[in-house]
């Protein structure tokens, strides 16, 4: 693809330029299609650029620092030219749509290959992939660049499964890192916390001990991360966990260590991921290389030049010198074909299950027979004097410090066109987002279909039926091999509030919670279902489940879940039940607002603080929800955060405090 370059080929600031990469594109030259991946800093789309299928990375530019980072990233990316580095095809470096355009890599990321498809590469495949990546790192380091986020999620695979090092959002020139050292930062009069925030970057489980100690980043930190990556490629295990599935990573990781505990163990105790076991075809020299790469002392780690030499030597030992031509990848050589055959023998499988769509289909089926001309849960008596709240509602959700979002939620005011019936719910996924995504689509239709029962019973049955439907759907996909992880058992906590005239019904399984502000004070509408609760512990044991003290608290074994009720988690049924606890509350004029939130909020904020923050915020429910979530993130919440705020009486958005 040859694209026309319009002169002057610079960014809006004039600081970025290229002779071969277009830096500003007419809007007619590209089309964004569906999102491929979403993160806290960018969204990646499948796109069409000048008639070619590409990947478009659209950064989230909320501050001037974000914009500065975009230009630094563009300057660096324009200077990269190596067969093992993801190629920048074009960029749009002018407002309002700042974007990067890259080749589209058919097989996704190495992380997906290992932990979604559960690929088990041969030693030949491991060596080819690691050697190509080592040469990409060698190229960067020899050009004075430190990547700072080497991990399988940042390795892309083409249709032949050759690897390409990608995502240079954190990459920096070594000279720039040396210029911004701690002493210079202090002399500028700036708080040292800002220095550490700018320099302690990357992904925790791949970060070198010196970075966790908040020392300066060097190329030796990339080597440490590369050693972790090689071991992960050999074992198929997410670092510091005992399971293959990426979806289970944060659950298992948290079961053993908090972030602080893991940091201390890596830095002070020399903790490392479980080393691959020596097998018949696994040379000891490769394991020695891994251990050398993750040495605590950076000076004892090999350079990228030495890593390449060692991997070439190991390859010759394994494959023989007569096949040494496979080591160099050129676009049209026979060695490419042979190498591709070696790497690709596992097939091109991608998990295609869309759990939102699966839930939506089932929801439509469940609601077909619902009679909507009958008033839902209508009152048995006509009392004109009965208090009926006037609602306004809003929500906010953020992935917080997580790399992915596993919460979902919905807000349905005036359900089925009933003026006084409203439904709200939050689903907090664990071991993946599948259960949460499915449940958010299914539950409303099931609640509507159960309108012939009482409102409380409708909620209860809807939870149980949603759980059953999800587990059946998951099993069906397992049987049809559309879900490749046989040991994948996703689940979610759930909390739903059904407001019928002046009655508020709350159903809950898990550790999300809901409170009312009643006459200025918090009024609990639910309680958390945790293994630390003696009643819940006894119930689980009575149902045949196991509760064990694991690291720091009671948990449901063997999965290590803290919650004792959930939707999904089919490996823990029936002990981890989906039957919710139901509360019924009669509302009055004393009730000011309802707050529902996932545990990412409640982990760092108590009921009184939540009430106080809303009282001190403009009375717009979405704004209140956002303020609570951002405050929780600022306080160090390590989880996804979802908040729903429902005002129960008329309020003015100009009113800041009561």
From Swiss-Prot:
Residues 30-314 form the Protein kinase domain. Gene3D superfamilies: PPM-type phosphatase domain (3.60.40.10), Transferase(Phosphotransferase) domain 1 (1.10.510.10). The active site is at 149 (proton acceptor). Mn(2+) 2 binds at residues 428, 599, 639. SMART domains: PP2C_SIG, PP2Cc, S_TKc. PROSITE patterns: PPM_2 (PS51746), PROTEIN_KINASE_DOM (PS50011), PROTEIN_KINASE_ST (PS00108). Binds 2 magnesium or manganese ions per subunit. Its cofactor is Mg(2+); Mn(2+). One of its GO terms (biological process) is L-ascorbic acid metabolic process. It catalyses: L-seryl-[protein] + ATP = O-phospho-L-seryl-[protein] + ADP + H(+); L-threonyl-[protein] + ATP = O-phospho-L-threonyl-[protein] + ADP + H(+); O-phospho-L-seryl-[protein] + H2O = L-seryl-[protein] + phosphate; O-phospho-L-threonyl-[protein] + H2O = L-threonyl-[protein] + phosphate. ATP binds at residues 36-44, 57. Mn(2+) 1 binds at residues 428-429. GO terms for molecular function: ATP binding; metal ion binding; protein serine kinase activity; protein serine/threonine kinase activity; protein serine/threonine phosphatase activity. Residues 392-648 form the PPM-type phosphatase domain. It comes from the Eukaryota. Its EC number is 2.7.11.1, 3.1.3.16. Keywords: ATP-binding, Hydrolase, Kinase, Magnesium, Manganese, Metal-binding, Multifunctional enzyme, Nucleotide-binding, Protein phosphatase, Serine/threonine-protein kinase, Transferase. In the N-terminal section; belongs to the protein kinase superfamily. Ser/Thr protein kinase family. This is Protein kinase and PP2C-like domain-containing protein.
């Amino acid at each position: 693809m040859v694209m026309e370059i319009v002169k002057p080929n610079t960014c809006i600031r004039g600081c970025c330029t290229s002779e071969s990469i277009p830096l500003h594109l007419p809007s007619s030259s590209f089309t964004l299609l569906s999102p491929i991946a979403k993160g806290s800093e960018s969204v990646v789309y499948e796109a069409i650029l000048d008639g070619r299928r590409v990947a478009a990375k659209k950064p989230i530019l909320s501050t001037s620092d974000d914009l500065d980072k975009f230009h630094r990233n563009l300057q660096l990316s324009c200077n990269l030219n190596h067969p093992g580095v993801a190629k920048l095809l074009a960029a749009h470096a002018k407002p309002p749509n700042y974007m990067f355009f890259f080749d589209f890599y058919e097989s996704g990321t190495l992380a997906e290959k290992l932990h979604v498809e559960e690929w088990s590469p041969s030693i030949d495949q491991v060596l080819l992939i690691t050697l190509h990546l080592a040469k990409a790192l060698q190229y960067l380091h020899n050009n004075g660049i430190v990547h700072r986020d080497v991990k399988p999620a940042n390795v892309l695979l083409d249709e032949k499964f050759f690897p390409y090092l990608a995502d240079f959002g954190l990459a920096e020139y070594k000279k720039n890192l040396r210029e911004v050292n701690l002493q210079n930062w202090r002399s500028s009069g700036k708080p040292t916390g800002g220095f550490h925030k700018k320099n302690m970057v990357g992904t925790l489980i791949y970060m070198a001990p010196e970075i966790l100690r908040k020392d300066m980043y060097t190329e030796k930190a990339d080597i440490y991360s590369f050693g972790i990556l090689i071991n992960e490629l050999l074992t198929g295990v997410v670092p510091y966990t005992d399971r293959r599935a990426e979806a289970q990573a944060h659950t298992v990781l948290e079961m053993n260590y908090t972030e602080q505990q893991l940091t201390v163990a890596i830095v002070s105790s020399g903790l490392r991921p479980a080393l691959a076991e020596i097998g018949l075809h696994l040379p000891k020299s490769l394991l020695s290389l891994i251990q050398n790469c993750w040495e605590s002392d950076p000076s004892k780690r090999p350079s990228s030049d030495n890593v390449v030499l060692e991997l070439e030597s190991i390859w010759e030992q394994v494959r023989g010198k007569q096949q040494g031509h496979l080591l160099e990848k050129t676009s049209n050589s026979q060695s490419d074909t042979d190498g591709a055959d070696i790497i690709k023998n596992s097939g091109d499988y991608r998990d295609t299950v869309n759990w939102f769509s699966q839930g939506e289909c089932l929801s439509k089926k469940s609601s077909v027979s619902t009679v909507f001309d009958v008033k839902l849960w209508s009152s048995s008596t006509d009392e004109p004097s009965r208090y009926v709240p006037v609602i306004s509602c809003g929500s906010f959700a953020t992935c917080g410090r997580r790399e992915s979002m596993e919460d979902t939620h919905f807000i349905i005011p005036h359900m089925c066109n009933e003026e006084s019936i409203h439904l709200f719910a939050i689903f907090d996924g664990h071991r993946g987002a599948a259960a949460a995504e499915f449940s958010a689509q299914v539950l409303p239709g099931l609640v509507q279909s159960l309108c012939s029962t009482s409102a409380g019973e409708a909620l209860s049955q809807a939870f149980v039926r949603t759980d059953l439907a999800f587990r059946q759907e998951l099993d069906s996909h397992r049987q049809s091999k559309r879900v490749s992880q046989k040991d994948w058992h996703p689940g979610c906590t759930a909390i739903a509030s059904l407001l019928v005239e002046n009655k508020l019904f709350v159903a809950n399984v898990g550790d999300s919670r809901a409170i009312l502000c009643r006459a200025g004070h918090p009024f609990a509408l639910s309680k958390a279902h945790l293994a630390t609760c003696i009643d819940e512990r006894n119930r689980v044991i009575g149902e045949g489940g196991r509760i064990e003290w694991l690291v720091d608290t009671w948990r449901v074994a063997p999965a290590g879940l803290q919650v004792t009720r959930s939707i999904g988690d089919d490996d823990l049924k029936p002990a981890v039940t989906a039957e919710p606890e139901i509360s019924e509350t009669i509302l009055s004029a004393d009730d000011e607002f309802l707050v529902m939130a996932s545990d990412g909020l409640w982990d760092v904020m108590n009921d009184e603080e939540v009430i106080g923050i809303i009282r001190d915020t403009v009375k717009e429910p979405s704004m209140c929800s956002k303020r609570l979530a951002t405050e929780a993130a600022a306080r160090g919440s390590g989880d996804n955060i979802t908040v729903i705020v429902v005002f129960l009486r008329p309020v003015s958005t100009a009113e800041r405090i009561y």
